[in-house]
């Protein structure tokens, strides 16, 4: 873990700081032997997970199901997004050459059938880390040939060659989040643009028309209903097939404040809007990009459009 300095920033770790939450955002956290096994496996292999680094509210639930989302290319990001709890640094260390094998070892122990990788933005690398991601995916395919792989990638600063490098790896789902509506993007996302994200999603869809393309947004940041509807339309128009929508919860007081707590009924409404546009939408207060990703893939492949019964 990098030591915080004037070039690094890490908000307080541990439990998310207390805010008064509406009743639909209060959880009974699962524990038990499966959670403990997952926790032990992650720690033993020394792998970073977005579950821990981003203080995800679903960590206990996911780990109790023996699922986790691996954080590739280290645990420090070259961008300082206002919603994110991951380390920021201007000078990240070189990628760990043992990381592909560590991730594969962990996934093998947990017997993962659907493996989700996310990444820190590596604007310091010429290809944004795309070739290193491919090394991880290749190792996973060698060690777990029956497992599917989903990658939540950065925008690679608009580098199409880097995108194609990643897409040629044989991944099952390419995921790139727009995170929020266009108007709020300059405040929410550091060094990223809404239009560039749409461009990368569209390029992926054009390059591999049969690939499952996924994106996601957070709500509760001050967006208007009409803006969410426009975002869903934009995603559908740019080749996206799967969309996740979840409630933004700030990790610390140094992050962007929550402007509203969106009701479950509103999430249902957004799901209906997205479905009418031909999107497969997983929406709910606790939904995150990788939450229940294996179930989302299963339902999509079995043409089950009703995700209301999925855990959210």
Curated annotation (Swiss-Prot):
Reaction(s) this enzyme catalyzes, per UniProt: [[Fe-S] cluster scaffold protein carrying a second [4Fe-4S](2+) cluster] + N(6)-octanoyl-L-lysyl-[protein] + 2 oxidized [2Fe-2S]-[ferredoxin] + 2 S-adenosyl-L-methionine + 4 H(+) = [[Fe-S] cluster scaffold protein] + N(6)-[(R)-dihydrolipoyl]-L-lysyl-[protein] + 4 Fe(3+) + 2 hydrogen sulfide + 2 5'-deoxyadenosine + 2 L-methionine + 2 reduced [2Fe-2S]-[ferredoxin]
The keyword Transcription is annotated on this UniProt entry: no
EC id: 2.8.1.8
Gene3D superfamilies in alphabetical order: Aldolase class I
Cofactor note: Binds 2 [4Fe-4S] clusters per subunit. One cluster is coordinated with 3 cysteines and an exchangeable S-adenosyl-L-methionine.
Radical SAM core domain residues: 63-280
Localization (cell): Cytoplasm
Binding-site list for [4Fe-4S] cluster 2: 77, 81, 84
Pfam family, any one: Radical_SAM
The name this protein goes by in its record: Lipoyl synthase
Organism: Chlamydia caviae (strain ATCC VR-813 / DSM 19441 / 03DC25 / GPIC)
């Amino acid at each position: 873990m990098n030591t915080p300095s004037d070039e690094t920033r890490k908000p307080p770790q541990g439990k998310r700081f207390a805010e008064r939450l509406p009743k639909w955002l209060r959880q009974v956290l699962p524990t038990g032997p499966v959670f403990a096994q997952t926790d032990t496996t992650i720690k033993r292999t020394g792998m970073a997970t977005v579950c821990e680094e981003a203080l995800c509210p679903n960590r206990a639930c996911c780990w109790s199901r023996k699922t986790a989302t691996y954080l590739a290319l280290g645990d420090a990001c070259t961008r300082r997004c206002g919603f994110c709890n991951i380390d920021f640094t201007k000078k990240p260390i070189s990628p760990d050459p043992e990381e592909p094998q560590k991730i594969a070892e962990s996934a093998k122990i947990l017997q993962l059938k659907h493996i989700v990788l996310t990444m820190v933005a590596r604007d310091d690398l010429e290809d944004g880390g795309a070739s290193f991601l491919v090394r991880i995916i290749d190792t996973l395919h060698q060690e777990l040939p029956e497992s599917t792989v989903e990658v939540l990638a950065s925008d690679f600063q608009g580098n199409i060659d880097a995108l194609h490098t990643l897409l040629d790896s044989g991944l099952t789902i390419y995921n790139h989040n727009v995170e929020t509506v266009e108007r709020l993007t300059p405040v929410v996302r550091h060094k990223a643009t809404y239009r560039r994200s749409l461009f990368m999603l569209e390029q992926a869809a054009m390059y591999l028309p049969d690939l499952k393309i996924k994106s996601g947004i957070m709500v509760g940041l001050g967006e208007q209903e009409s803006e969410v509807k426009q975002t869903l339309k934009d995603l559908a128009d740019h080749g996206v097939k799967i969309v996740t929508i979840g409630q933004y919860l700030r990790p610390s007081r140094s992050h962007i404040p929550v402007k509203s707590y969106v009701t479950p009924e509103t999430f249902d409404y957004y799901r209906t809007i997205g479905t009418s546009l031909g999107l497969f939408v997983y929406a709910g207060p606790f939904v995150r990009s990788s939450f229940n990703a294996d179930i989302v893939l299963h339902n999509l492949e079995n043409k089950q459009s009703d995700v209301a019964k999925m855990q959210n």
